[in-house]
């Protein structure tokens, strides 16, 4: 008898269910989650670059790897933004870190979100990718509320190999994503 870790999913069941649902001929046709991108944009970084240090540290805590600082692609004078200014940070998770993050998201983070009734089923891009936003970073168990200087939101993009939204939605449902009806 083998002991199974609490934070893992049974991919053979997910694959079997998807093959049965969509009548795939080969296992290679079954959609998979390719990567998860976590992005935190910080508008305050225009005036105070030190704010980015907090964001980088928080992303490092919740993802387990070092984030990349994102820079402005073009200048916008109304926001006093110049091209190349640091305005946020992002992390791309693949492999075991991606799986652990998705598991943590569905089992720990969503239950801690205030007034949570499920995630929207309309946030697919038409090509099987899903985007969602969280309003506060303190819902993650790694973030210490006492050390947070300002509550910030984040974007989480789940990139799949699915060809359309229905395949991607079924895949994410099998991963444990709680969609609204």
Curated annotation (Swiss-Prot):
PROSITE patterns xref list:
RIBOSOMAL_L5
Question: Which superkingdom is the protein from?
Answer: Bacteria
Entry keyword set: Ribonucleoprotein, Ribosomal protein, RNA-binding, rRNA-binding, tRNA-binding
Q: Name one GO cellular component term.
A: ribosome
Molecular function (GO) terms listed? rRNA binding; structural constituent of ribosome; tRNA binding
Biological process GO terms, please? translation
SUPFAM superfamilies the record matches: RL5-like
What the protein does?
A: This is one of the proteins that bind and probably mediate the attachment of the 5S RNA into the large ribosomal subunit, where it forms part of the central protuberance. In the 70S ribosome it contacts protein S13 of the 30S subunit (bridge B1b), connecting the 2 subunits; this bridge is implicated in subunit movement. Contacts the P site tRNA; the 5S rRNA and some of its associated proteins might help stabilize positioning of ribosome-bound tRNAs.
Q: How does it assemble?
A: Part of the 50S ribosomal subunit; part of the 5S rRNA/L5/L18/L25 subcomplex. Contacts the 5S rRNA and the P site tRNA. Forms a bridge to the 30S subunit in the 70S ribosome.
* HAMAP family noted in UniProt: Ribosomal_uL5_B
What the record says about family reads: Belongs to the universal ribosomal protein uL5 family.
Protein name as it appears in the record? Large ribosomal subunit protein uL5
**Source organism of the structure:** Onion yellows phytoplasma (strain OY-M)
Q: Which gene encodes it?
A: rplE
């Amino acid at each position: 008898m083998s002991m199974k870790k609490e934070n893992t999913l049974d991919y053979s069941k997910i694959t079997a269910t998807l093959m049965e649902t969509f009548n795939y001929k080969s296992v290679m046709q079954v959609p998979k989650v390719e990567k998860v991108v976590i992005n935190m944009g910080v508008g305050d970084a225009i005036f105070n670059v030190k704010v980015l240090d907090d964001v980088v540290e928080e992303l490092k805590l919740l993802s387990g790897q070092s984030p990349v600082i994102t820079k402005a692609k073009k200048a916008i004078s109304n926001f006093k933004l110049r091209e190349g200014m640091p305005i946020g940070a992002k992390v791309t998770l693949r492999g075991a870190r991606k799986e652990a993050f998705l598991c943590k998201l569905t089992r720990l983070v969503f239950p801690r979100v205030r007034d949570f009734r499920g995630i929207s089923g309309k946030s697919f891009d038409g090509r099987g990718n899903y985007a969602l936003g969280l309003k506060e970073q303190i819902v993650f168990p790694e973030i210490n509320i006492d050390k947070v200087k300002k509550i910030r939101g984040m974007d989480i993009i789940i990139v799949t190999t699915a060809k359309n939204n229905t395949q991607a939605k079924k895949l994410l449902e099998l991963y444990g994503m709680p969609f609204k009806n």
